[in-house]
Regions:
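Acidic, glycine-anchored loop motifs typical of Ca2+
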Residues: 5-14, 192
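Low-complexity, serine/threonine/proline-enriched polar segments
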Residues: 23-126
Length: 192
């Protein structure tokens, strides 16, 4: 979240993270950066026969922790995966990366379960689970993890906090259709 401290109506002031249940856990990676690369025009797909995966090497990525990989393309999502509205052949995101929460319960790649984090993350619990699917700006921390007091938030940014693939389901991604300002005065959600 960010406050428009300079009053120019642009999200160019300091951003603060809302520290959810995983923020202080040792397996959480802070200051994580990942760069995705546009698939070259002459790319030859590498499918896995008799599966929904149509290209195992579709979009290359590299992270600042030294890990590398590919976003696989599957037959359920035929659109381009790389943003077509940018001119650059690479796009970089930075933030906090949570530990994987997807388990292949079948052991053969046919049944993935994404187990919910306890609280404080979008697209994580059903909406009716109010204490776990809402946010509180009292959880705001600065880039060093120090709590900060905010009187409000003018800008809100939501991003996918994991880097994991679930086989035929594809890459785990946050899907959000709306947000609502509830101005909750009392909360049973614990502060980190």
């Amino acid at each position: 979240v960010a406050l428009d401290r300079n009053g120019n109506g642009l999200p160019d002031d300091e951003w603060y993270e809302l520290a959810g249940s995983e923020y202080h856990k040792p397996e959480t990676a802070h200051n994580y950066t990942i760069t995705y690369y546009r698939t070259p025009a002459d790319h030859v797909a590498t499918p896995i026969p008799q599966t929904p995966i149509t290209d195992t090497s579709y979009i290359a990525w590299i992270a600042n922790d030294g890990s590398t990989g590919y976003i696989e393309k599957n037959s359920y999502h035929r659109q381009e995966y790389f943003p077509q509205w940018i001119d650059s052949d690479e796009i970089t995101f930075s933030g906090t990366r949570l530990a994987h929460n997807a388990i292949d319960e079948s052991g053969i790649g046919s049944y993935y379960v994404l187990y919910a984090y306890d609280w404080g993350y979008a697209d994580n619990h059903p909406n009716e689970v109010e204490d776990k699917s809402c946010f509180n700006i009292d959880w705001a921390v600065d880039q060093d993890g120090n709590p900060v007091h905010l009187d409000g938030a003018d800008f809100i940014r939501v991003f996918t906090g994991v880097n994991q693939s679930c086989g035929w389901l594809g890459e785990t991604s946050t899907e959000l259709c709306r947000a609502e300002d509830l101005h909750i005065e009392l909360s049973t959600i614990p502060n980190p």
